[in-house]
From Swiss-Prot:
Pfam families, sorted: SelR
Residues annotated as catalytic: 124 (nucleophile)
Named cofactor requirement(s): Zn(2+)
PROSITE patterns: MSRB (PS51790)
InterPro entries: Met_Sox_Rdtase_MsrB, Met_Sox_Rdtase_MsrB_dom, Mss4-like_sf
Gene name as annotated: msrB
EC number: 1.8.4.12
Stated name of the protein: Peptide methionine sulfoxide reductase MsrB
Keyword DNA-binding among record annotations: no
Catalyzed chemical reaction(s): L-methionyl-[protein] + [thioredoxin]-disulfide + H2O = L-methionyl-(R)-S-oxide-[protein] + [thioredoxin]-dithiol
Disulfide-linked positions: none
Amino acid sequence: MDRTIDDPVEASENDWRSKLTPEQFRITREGGTERAFTGAYWNHKGDGMYRCICCGAELFRSDRKFDSGTGWPSFWEGVNPEAIRTIQDVSHGMVRTEIRCAKCDSHLGHVFQDSPTPTGLRYCVNSASLDFKDKT
């Protein structure tokens, strides 16, 4: 289902629980983090688009993915600036920048300014918050 940023997805907690696996719910709706090197996409090499598992919004292109050595899928740029929103995260005694899907407000991960990429950014994303659609 394709939606625009101006057409946000709203659902009840029960709706999300019925749509998502327990791990996907914990990460996307409760702000959890999967263990490094355990997610389906940390070492994924497919050619296509990574979408939000909750609403299907296009978030990251595979040609913007790189191996950061962290054990999570890492991208140096989102599909467009409006697809991902950022908020300050002060949990766990740290100050970080959380990234969320702009359409459904699902937690994706965090963005850091520490990568040797064209933007200098590393979008560190939980695999459980993503669905991959092959280009073919």
